[in-house]
């Protein structure tokens, strides 16, 4: 059960890693760093030749998550400090973007020498799955404003063809005249 939840959009962290996650989701003692992609992939690849500068976006966000929990940074006065972080990489890929994530982990291990890097902190889903989840929410469990929000999100995802293949349907269900 989650007792506290807050969303922080596009917060810029110039130090220490120069990164701006799309959304920080604060849940009790957990931070979820959401990186959402639509037409572009992650920004940056690898490190500088001397490993002093980290270019890989997911790797920088991983280090940010680690920094936020080890430094006990206060992001909001209603939360004390965080014990763990997760990265949620949201793309329109149909399958897990293996090369993106493997490259980020490889870069982290090269850059972050002497520290443990865990792929268990990195999760992925796609927009199509978000559509499926939203579409299967029970309207009885939602407040009126949530119903409106879900409806608008579903419409947004439909207009961008971010829905899963759902089998064949009979044409007589549609008004084709």
Per-segment meaning from a language model:
Residues 1-177:
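Charged, terminal alpha-helix-loop-beta segments
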